[in-house]
Amino acid sequence: MTVLEDRIAMAEDSGELTLDAMFEWLEKMPVPEGYKVEIVGGNIFMSPQRRTHWQIIFNILDQLRARYARQRLMSDVRIDFPGHLNGFAADVAALAEGFEPDDRGRLRYQDVEFIAEVISKDTATNDYEPKLAAYAAAEVPAYLIVDPYTGKWHLHTLPKDGEYRGHQSLDFGYEIDLTGTVVGLVLKTDEFPRD
C-alpha cells in the first residue's frame, strides 16, 4: 500500500495490508505530539504519554542500566512481533548483547530479553491480552505489566508453546525479582507513582 495525497492505494499484488504500509501511512499523518502509536492485531492505537507513565518508564530504564548498556535499552521503538499485524512500540525493551538489526535496520523480536508496558486506561486490554500472547509467542523471557491505576505489577516469565508458565503479581513497593531470568537483577518499585 502506498499513501497518496488524498487516498490510500493498494500497491502490493496481494492487496493485503502490511505493517510497513501502515507505519508509512502513520508517518504521514498528523499524530499529536506526546502520543504513542502502535499497531496491535491490525488496529491502530494512539495513547497520550502521561507524566506518571513516563516516570515509571524512566525508573525502570534507570534500574536496567545496572545490567544493560544504554544502546541495548529502547523505549517506544517499533518492533514487529508474531501474530497478525503486530507492530509494537514497547514502553521498555531490553535487547540481548550483540543484537543486530535486520536487513531493513529494524529491531528483531528474537533479540528482546525483557519488555515492560505501563498501562494506559484506554489501551490496557492490549497489554493484558494480545500483547501478552504475542510476547509469549515470541518467547520474550520476561514481560512486566505495570498498572499505576491499581498500584500493582504483573511479571510473566517462562514462555513455552505460546504462553507464559510463570506469573507473579504484587503491589507497588514489592521488589520484582528477575534474577531467575536472563535479566539477572531485582527492580525496586517503591518509587513507582500511582495515577
Regions found by a protein language model. Name each.
Residues M1-D195:
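Gly/Pro/Ser/Thr-rich low-complexity, intrinsically disordered segments predominantly at protein N-termini
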